[in-house]
């Protein structure tokens, strides 16, 4: 029946128009809608039998810090609702990737991991202890003398050594856990500058993370994020907040790492920028290196961002890709939506989910600027959070709204979104707070939690790995987290995997979809649109 409906352009056009005219029909009650939608998905799955085995010229890794599967689902609903839909049926950009795997996130010494040990896994290819960066599990957190000899390198370095351009873009400080594992070897993730290090570690010769950013891999092509204060001598006023002492420079060694970078790069087409105007005024064709430090510490939440002075993650990714893709040898780019994690730790689900939506926009922008023929794109998380939503809510319920029921214990309402622990635990006269008396829709509302903690914790369940492009099919099943960079390296012929590279570049990629498949996709999309207008 499907084939007869879509056997020609004319019939497809006729059916599509008829669907649009009849959009008031309640398609969710019509079995044809679900059958056609499933058939479209089946056709797309059958196309995947022709695997893309090209060598990946480019690799992009999008890392949503703390972006567990419940966060992905809730952000999908939010993004759909922001576009006027009920939300559940919406497709995120990452949802469109053809391959999905699960990643086991534990650290070598932790069932529920931290972001440093996990970053070492998905960037360097080895599991590590919590709190350590770019070191094997033989290193012990905060013990400087366990650093030397236990260093492990990252896929960013493997790509750089292979002649590719490399970049890091993050919404956190550039020396935070996720980006740091790409270039640093540090026994403690909190050694942001020498000011945060114990004197004995400095005396023993261990380097702070900010210093390693510029010394370990001296010519990272693109660096964008926050963390300005860690680059300047102690008590140096910040360029943007010159009267606020909490933003002054922190370095005890007196070094000005930004000035040193500018001096070292003066013969190259290199630019230092610290605000949105400077970033967007750059001509990527005339810039080969960029150091962008947009805040003294982390960048603001996207909901609180000054759109005149602070670049969005999407804007940073856009500029980064336009610079990196000029290299005929290709590039590696790490992009972190880092403040998803911070929103969850603060119990501020609205902030966390809007950060996830913004990262998804950046994924979409990257897709427009690259080709799946030559670019492997991977989207994943380092860990989850004890965040969830439930309560038998109806279709289209505001994701930040109330469940349609009262507690049968205390007879009070509750929000659909809840945390297992965190700062949202509140008692009024010894009883649970009545959420109907507060503004639970405001940006910084802290959702209720079962256990009181100053900061909500990570979760220990597996996280999703979405992939598309060359060799994306290798990211399948349930895998250890450290498997991810091995696949990326294999796809790009960097690091230790070279034996397959001679013939891969001529391998076939997925063919263009057939006219019938295209017609089914068009029809299913039209049915969806009609349904959404019901």
What are these regions (language model features)?
Residues 14-18, 23-41, 52-57, 67-73, ...:
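A post-motif C-terminal structural segment
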Residues 1-19, 529-534:
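N-terminal signal peptide
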Residues 141-143:
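Short, contiguous strand/loop micro-motifs
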Residues 499-521:
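C-terminal GPI-anchoring signal of eukaryotic secretory precursors
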Residues 1-5, 413, 507, 518:
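Intrinsic disorder/low-complexity segments
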Residues 45-46, 51-75, 122, 127-138, ...:
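Mobile, glycine-rich extracellular loop/lid and propeptide segments
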Residues 519-530:
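Disordered regulatory segments flanking catalytic cores
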């Amino acid at each position: 029946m499907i084939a007869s409906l879509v056997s020609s352009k004319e019939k497809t056009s006729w059916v599509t128009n008829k669907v649009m005219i009849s959009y008031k029909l309640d398609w969710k009650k019509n079995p044809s809608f679900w059958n056609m939608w499933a058939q479209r998905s089946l056709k797309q799955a059958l196309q995947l039998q022709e695997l893309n085995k090209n060598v990946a010229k480019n690799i992009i890794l999008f890392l949503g810090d703390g972006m567990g599967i419940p966060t992905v689902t809730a952000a999908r609903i939010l993004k759909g609702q922001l576009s006027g839909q009920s939300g559940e049926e919406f497709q995120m950009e990452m949802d469109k990737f053809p391959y999905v795997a699960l990643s086991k996130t534990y650290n070598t010494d932790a069932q529920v991991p931290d972001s440093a040990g996990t970053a070492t896994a998905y960037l360097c290819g080895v599991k590590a202890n919590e709190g350590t960066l770019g070191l094997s599990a033989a290193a012990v957190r905060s013990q400087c003398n366990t650093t030397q000899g236990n260093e492990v390198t990252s896929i960013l370095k493997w790509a750089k050594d292979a002649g590719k351009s490399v970049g890091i873009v993050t919404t956190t400080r550039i020396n935070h856990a996720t980006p740091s594992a790409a270039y640093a070897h540090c026994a403690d993730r909190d050694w942001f500058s020498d000011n945060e290090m114990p004197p004995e570690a400095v005396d023993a010769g261990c380097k702070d993370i900010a210093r390693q950013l510029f010394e370990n891999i001296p010519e990272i092509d693109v660096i964008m994020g926050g963390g300005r204060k860690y680059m300047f001598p102690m008590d140096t006023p910040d360029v943007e907040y010159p009267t606020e002492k909490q933003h002054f420079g922190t370095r005890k060694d007196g070094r000005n790492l930004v000035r040193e970078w500018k001096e070292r790069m003066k013969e190259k087409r290199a630019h230092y920028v610290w605000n949105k105007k400077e970033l967007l005024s750059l001509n990527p064709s005339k810039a080969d290196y960029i150091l962008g430090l947009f805040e003294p510490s982390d960048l603001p939440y996207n909901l609180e961002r000054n759109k005149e002075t602070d670049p969005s993650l999407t804007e940073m990714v856009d500029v980064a890709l336009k610079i990196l893709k000029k290299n005929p040898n290709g590039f590696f780019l790490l992009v972190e939506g880092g403040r998803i994690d911070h929103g969850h730790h603060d119990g501020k689900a609205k902030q966390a989910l809007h950060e996830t939506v913004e990262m998804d926009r950046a994924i979409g922008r990257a897709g427009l600027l690259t080709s799946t023929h030559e670019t492997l794109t991977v989207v994943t998380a380092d860990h989850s959070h004890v965040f969830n939503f439930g309560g038998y809510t109806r279709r289209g319920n505001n994701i930040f709204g109330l469940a349609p029921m009262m507690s049968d214990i205390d007879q009070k309402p509750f929000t659909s979104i809840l945390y297992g622990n965190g700062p949202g635990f509140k008692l009024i006269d010894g009883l649970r707070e009545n959420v109907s008396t507060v503004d639970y829709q405001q940006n910084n509302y802290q959702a209720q939690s079962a256990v009181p903690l100053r900061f909500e914790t990570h979760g220990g369940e597996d996280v999703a790995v979405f992939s598309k492009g060359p060799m994306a099919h290798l990211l399948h099943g349930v895998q250890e987290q450290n498997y991810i960079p091995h696949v990326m390296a294999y796809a790009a012929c960097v690091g230790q995997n070279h034996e397959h590279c001679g013939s891969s570049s001529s391998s076939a990629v997925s063919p263009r979809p057939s006219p019938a498949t295209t017609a089914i996709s068009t029809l299913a999309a039209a049915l969806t649109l009609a349904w959404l207008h019901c």
